[in-house]
Amino acid sequence: MKNKGCAFEIQGGGTSRYFTSPLVHGFADFVRFLDENQGEAGHAPLPLHKRIPQATQISEAEWRNIADNQDTGYSCFIVVNIAENQVWVNEDTGAGMALYCFPFLAVMEVAASGAADPWETLLAKYPSAKMSG
Protein backbone atom coordinates (compact mmCIF):
# COMPACT_ATOMS: atom_id res chain seq x y z
CA MET A 1 0.00 0.00 0.00
CA LYS A 2 1.25 3.48 -0.87
CA ASN A 3 2.24 5.61 2.11
CA LYS A 4 0.14 8.78 2.03
CA GLY A 5 2.33 10.43 4.67
CA CYS A 6 0.78 11.96 7.79
CA ALA A 7 -2.45 13.74 8.56
CA PHE A 8 -2.39 16.55 11.07
CA GLU A 9 -4.67 19.04 12.78
CA ILE A 10 -3.51 22.43 14.01
CA GLN A 11 -5.68 24.00 16.71
CA GLY A 12 -5.13 27.63 17.55
CA GLY A 13 -6.85 30.98 17.58
CA GLY A 14 -10.19 29.34 18.26
CA THR A 15 -10.15 27.29 15.06
CA SER A 16 -8.88 23.97 13.78
CA ARG A 17 -7.33 23.39 10.39
CA TYR A 18 -6.58 20.01 8.90
CA PHE A 19 -3.79 18.94 6.56
CA THR A 20 -2.04 16.00 4.98
CA SER A 21 1.49 15.79 3.61
CA PRO A 22 2.96 12.90 1.65
CA LEU A 23 6.47 14.02 2.63
CA VAL A 24 5.91 13.57 6.37
CA HIS A 25 6.39 9.86 7.04
CA GLY A 26 6.32 10.17 10.81
CA PHE A 27 6.57 12.45 13.80
CA ALA A 28 10.36 12.76 13.39
CA ASP A 29 9.86 14.26 9.90
CA PHE A 30 7.18 16.60 11.24
CA VAL A 31 9.52 17.87 13.98
CA ARG A 32 12.43 18.29 11.57
CA PHE A 33 10.32 20.33 9.13
CA LEU A 34 9.14 22.63 11.94
CA ASP A 35 12.70 23.88 12.30
CA GLU A 36 14.06 23.54 8.76
CA ASN A 37 11.31 25.59 7.17
CA GLN A 38 10.59 28.24 9.79
CA GLY A 39 11.12 31.17 7.42
CA GLU A 40 13.76 33.69 6.50
CA ALA A 41 15.81 35.49 9.12
CA GLY A 42 14.49 38.94 9.95
CA HIS A 43 10.92 38.02 9.07
CA ALA A 44 8.06 36.63 11.12
CA PRO A 45 8.20 32.82 11.41
CA LEU A 46 6.00 30.90 9.00
CA PRO A 47 2.77 29.42 10.34
CA LEU A 48 3.21 25.76 11.28
CA HIS A 49 1.33 24.35 8.29
CA LYS A 50 3.50 26.36 5.88
CA ARG A 51 6.63 24.76 7.33
CA ILE A 52 5.47 21.32 6.23
CA PRO A 53 6.29 20.62 2.56
CA GLN A 54 3.38 19.69 0.31
CA ALA A 55 0.87 20.25 3.11
CA THR A 56 -2.60 20.16 1.60
CA GLN A 57 -5.53 21.52 3.56
CA ILE A 58 -8.45 19.11 3.89
CA SER A 59 -11.94 19.47 5.31
CA GLU A 60 -12.89 18.50 8.85
CA ALA A 61 -15.00 15.67 7.42
CA GLU A 62 -11.98 14.32 5.52
CA TRP A 63 -9.83 14.60 8.65
CA ARG A 64 -12.40 12.76 10.75
CA ASN A 65 -12.68 10.01 8.15
CA ILE A 66 -8.89 9.60 8.06
CA ALA A 67 -8.24 9.89 11.81
CA ASP A 68 -11.32 8.12 13.18
CA ASN A 69 -10.80 5.16 10.87
CA GLN A 70 -7.01 5.30 11.25
CA ASP A 71 -6.67 5.09 7.49
CA THR A 72 -3.92 2.53 6.95
CA GLY A 73 -2.42 4.61 4.14
CA TYR A 74 -1.26 7.23 6.66
CA SER A 75 1.78 6.56 8.82
CA CYS A 76 0.81 8.94 11.62
CA PHE A 77 -1.82 11.31 12.92
CA ILE A 78 -0.79 14.47 14.76
CA VAL A 79 -2.85 17.06 16.63
CA VAL A 80 -1.12 20.30 17.62
CA ASN A 81 -3.05 22.31 20.21
CA ILE A 82 -1.11 25.54 20.57
CA ALA A 83 -3.29 27.11 23.29
CA GLU A 84 -3.15 23.98 25.48
CA ASN A 85 0.59 23.43 24.80
CA GLN A 86 -0.02 19.88 23.57
CA VAL A 87 1.07 17.74 20.64
CA TRP A 88 -0.78 14.43 20.33
CA VAL A 89 0.89 11.82 18.13
CA ASN A 90 -0.62 8.52 17.02
CA GLU A 91 2.08 6.54 15.25
CA ASP A 92 3.39 3.00 14.94
CA THR A 93 6.88 3.15 16.41
CA GLY A 94 7.45 -0.58 16.08
CA ALA A 95 4.85 -2.29 18.25
CA GLY A 96 1.62 -1.12 16.61
CA MET A 97 -0.14 2.23 16.78
CA ALA A 98 0.37 4.09 20.04
CA LEU A 99 -0.76 7.48 21.33
CA TYR A 100 1.72 9.98 22.80
CA CYS A 101 1.30 13.48 24.23
CA PHE A 102 4.15 15.99 24.47
CA PRO A 103 4.23 19.67 25.43
CA PHE A 104 4.15 21.78 22.26
CA LEU A 105 6.94 24.04 23.52
CA ALA A 106 9.15 21.00 24.18
CA VAL A 107 8.55 19.77 20.63
CA MET A 108 9.54 23.18 19.28
CA GLU A 109 12.69 23.16 21.47
CA VAL A 110 13.66 19.73 20.16
CA ALA A 111 13.01 20.93 16.60
CA ALA A 112 15.27 23.94 17.16
CA SER A 113 17.99 21.76 18.70
CA GLY A 114 18.29 19.68 15.54
CA ALA A 115 18.15 16.46 17.57
CA ALA A 116 18.87 13.46 15.35
CA ASP A 117 16.07 11.45 16.97
CA PRO A 118 13.20 13.60 18.30
CA TRP A 119 11.49 10.49 19.72
CA GLU A 120 14.51 9.57 21.83
CA THR A 121 14.99 13.13 23.06
CA LEU A 122 11.33 13.70 23.95
CA LEU A 123 10.75 10.28 25.53
CA ALA A 124 13.89 10.70 27.67
CA LYS A 125 12.48 13.96 29.00
CA TYR A 126 8.83 12.82 29.13
CA PRO A 127 8.87 9.05 29.83
CA SER A 128 5.16 9.02 30.65
CA ALA A 129 4.21 10.58 27.29
CA LYS A 130 2.91 7.25 25.98
CA MET A 131 -0.81 7.29 26.65
CA SER A 132 -1.88 4.01 25.00
CA GLY A 133 -0.75 1.26 22.67
Where are these regions (language model features)?
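Alpha-helix boundary/N-cap detector
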Residues: 21-28, 102, 113-117
